[in-house]
Design a protein with these regions (language model features):
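Active-site-proximal structural scaffolding
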Residues: 71, 99-100, 135
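Basic, alpha-helical interaction scaffolds
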Residues: 18-90
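Short helix-interrupting loop/turn segments at helix-coil junctions
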Residues: 108-118
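Extended C-terminal regions of large enzymes
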Residues: 125-191
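Short, conserved micro-motifs composed of acidic
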Residues: 1-26
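Alpha-helical bundle/repeat cores within regulatory domains of eukaryotic proteins
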Residues: 119-125
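Short amphipathic alpha-helical coiled-coil/interface segments
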Residues: 98-107, 139-142
Length: 191
């Protein structure tokens, strides 16, 4: 698999012990599916499939009459399948929107509506962060854990790339202990 300007160019096959290693368009590494392309991209099809399987399993057992219980269980079991390792990825806007739409589908099923404003209000009053907001929280916590790491190698590597966390705080105008509350305050107005 290749990433960069020449990702479409044909390469000489790599051989190890007379076995040819084939180039592929997509690969799985540590549970994350990475696609070849001009820039590094991720494939969330498997993550969405696992999310839907978990959410549908929960709904089949609990039903849609108790959405608070369904959402609590989905937050514990289905959302981690969808957001696995996203805190370490630099996702573009379309990838974040794809993840948001996946959860929006769950709300459509639970509340029997397709109206975006109704879904936004349901998310707000059920205290359910969108995946894109959840990724912001997870990324911020990930950066904080790198800063506070006792491993000196991690600290050195992170200090080389520490622009990310200051840019991150400036981009979202967030920081400190009230990160979720700051994101929560603007949830309805971003729809």
């Amino acid at each position: 698999m290749r990433v960069g300007k020449k990702y479409k160019n044909v390469c000489i096959p790599i051989c190890i012990s007379q076995n040819v290693i084939k180039f592929c368009e997509e690969m799985r590494y540590l549970g994350v599916y990475v696609r070849s392309g001009l820039i590094l991209k991720f494939n969330f099809d498997q993550a969405k499939r696992k999310f839907y399987a978990s959410a549908n399993g929960i709904i089949s057992k609990v039903g849609t009459l108790k959405p608070d219980i369904v959402l609590s269980l989905c937050n514990s079991f289905a959302i981690p399948c969808l957001l696995y390792a996203t805190e370490a990825m630099l996702l573009n806007k379309s990838e974040r929107k794809t993840l948001d739409n996946t959860v929006r589908r769950l709300f459509m099923k639970l509340f029997h509506t397709a109206d975006p404003s109704v879904i936004a209000h349901c998310q707000y009053y059920m205290y359910f962060l969108q995946p894109s907001d959840n990724i912001i929280v997870r990324t911020f916590n990930f950066y904080q854990s790198l800063i506070n790491s006792s491993n000196t190698i991690v600290q050195i590597i992170f200090s080389l790339f520490n622009k990310n966390i200051s840019n991150f705080g400036e981009k979202y105008n967030i920081g400190g202990n009230k990160l979720k509350q700051q994101l929560w305050g603007g949830l309805l107005f971003r729809q």
